[in-house]
């Protein structure tokens, strides 16, 4: 089974730039997209019924903000977008799909870059989310977490760690939560196969030439619970 995660930064723009063609060429079984920035009434029939895929959406109340969608060829046993938590449910950040062998969480985690209040919200989201995944995992089924985590975990995961020790997305308290996730038995699938630095998923558009010079951050991840380790055959970052 092939899974892909992608922060599209606006699904309508990505659609015009060839998202359907990309999906067809990728031959993914499941595609998880984040930051769709779309309202329910703006989702077109073509977006809902991408050939061969069922789609499941979570949208934010705020227009043009957040949102995630999961495109799945296999039909899930169950789908959830609300979890009885104001912290987790408020901004359209999670789609959970259940399959015979695992639960899949497609998540757009909050960004802490707008000050102390948003950092506190991000940390609360992190903690409530981990509690949610652990409850499901304790019932005996493995868990996959993918999406934009909005944190670079280690110094290997960004080009200039020393410059960014107090930057949103690399503060010690944010990184500690990713370490906590790993300590709970969730494996960073990319690091199973790649141990060197220099591999990133986000480049700041405000930095001139950041992508060309590969001055980036790895903030997008696939984590799998220990039970699923033997099922992971490959992991990488698409160009």
How should these model regions be labeled?
Residues 1-50, 54, 60-66:
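N-terminal, active-site-proximal structural segment of metallo-dependent hydrolase catalytic domains
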Residues 1-9, 101-113, 146:
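Active-site-proximal beta-strand elements of phosphoester/diester hydrolases
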Residues 7, 23-41, 104, 133-155, ...:
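Active-site beta-strand/loop signature of hydrolases that rely on acidic residues for catalysis
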Residues 25, 40, 79-83, 155-239:
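Metal-dependent phosphoester-hydrolase catalytic domains
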Residues 37, 45-112:
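Structured beta-strand-rich core segments of catalytic domains in phosphoester-bond hydrolases
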Residues 84-85, 110-126, 162-166:
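Surface-exposed cleft-lining segments at the edges of enzyme active sites
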Residues 119-140:
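A long, amphipathic alpha-helix that forms part
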